[in-house]
Amino acid sequence: MKSTLFSVAKETLQGVFHAHNWGQEFSEDLLETLIEEARINLNRKARLCLHPNPNEPLQVTYLAFSSPYSDRIHKHPHRPEVLVPIFGQAKHTTFDNAAVAVSSKIIDGRLPIAISTPKGVWHAIEVITPSFVMIEIGTGPFLKDSTVFLQNS
């Protein structure tokens, strides 16, 4: 499976692939390949970034998750984030500063309606189905402080 990803992307971290260039064509089994990669990764997640590197001003990423998976509560202090579910289901929850849930919504690939999270809002996803794939859209560059995790969450 990785050989398919390596033909179109470079693995920059375990389970994180960046396309060789914008406009790259991907095979029809892309989602299956990413889901399989998520199953074998210790963090239960795999990413294919359509942007060739983290410095790009536009960041578009396919993210695949394998159950059981739950994000740590986090926020993006410098940018909003848009998620589009394309396969499976997950629960998207926003939180206050005390890690108390403020809102929660099921996002479903059968109804691929985008959900946006404003910059600075604590949030997380929890995968409900055996696998879940979404597209994440944000602005770059992606820096060390682009994602901040809530302490004790």
Report residues per predicted region:
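A short, N-terminal "cap"/entry segment at the start of jelly-roll beta-barrel domains
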Residues: 1-57, 103-108
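Short strand-connecting beta-turns/loops that link adjacent beta-strands
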Residues: 55-56, 78, 130
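Conserved double-stranded beta-helix
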Residues: 55-70
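His/acidic/aromatic-lined binding-pocket segments of jelly-roll/cupin-type domains
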Residues: 62-63, 74-75, 80-85, 114-115, ...
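Glycine- and acidic-residue-biased ligand/ion/polar-headgroup-sensing regions
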Residues: 67, 77-97
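Extended, positively charged loop/linker patches that create polyanion-binding surfaces
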Residues: 78, 95-113
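Double-stranded beta-helix
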Residues: 98-101, 105, 124-153
